[in-house]
Amino acid sequence: MNNHQHPASLITSPASRRGFIRGGSALSAVAVALLAGKDVMAQGMKGDTSKDVDILNVALGLEHEAINAYQLGAGSGLLQKPVMDVAVQFQGHHKTHRDALVATIRKLGGQPVAEMKLDEYAKALNAGALKSQGDVLDLAARLELGATNAYLSVIPALGDRELAKVAARLAADETMHYTVLTSALGRPLPPGALSFGA
């Protein structure tokens, strides 16, 4: 992947998300230590950071996508005030995730993938088809579920409990977002246990 490009197909296609999930298991302890803010811990570690940068850039692409999806929803005029407030809050969570990923990529010597223009996300996400608040919430729920599963995929590769906790916290945010959105849509929650990350 070219770190300066951010093709819409990379972040919006299910195949790319599956690739991130498969590749995520190779995320090194160095990258996760930096993502966790454990710079001192990372200094003594060795690892191939180029693969880590690629994996983290895909995660960053997902965060860029989520931030812009919420922006499209907020600017659509379709959201009622209470829903708008929650959307802005969730967008803030994604901005925090983005900032952590950008800092980690830079600490690894990589170039963070650039955010596309809002109209590029609008096209990639088919924002023109959004005709109701339900449509906006459905789009957000689908993206949050994809992000949940992507973040959960990296946890098994982590041997250190503190490092696994970082990935779990990211996944927890995405799961919370998905659950709130699903509930707002009036849909039943997943009927079975262990329904995320499978």
Where are these regions (language model features)?
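All-alpha RGS (Regulator of G-protein Signaling) helical domain and cognate RGS-like helical scaffolds
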Residues: 2-11, 25-29, 35-198
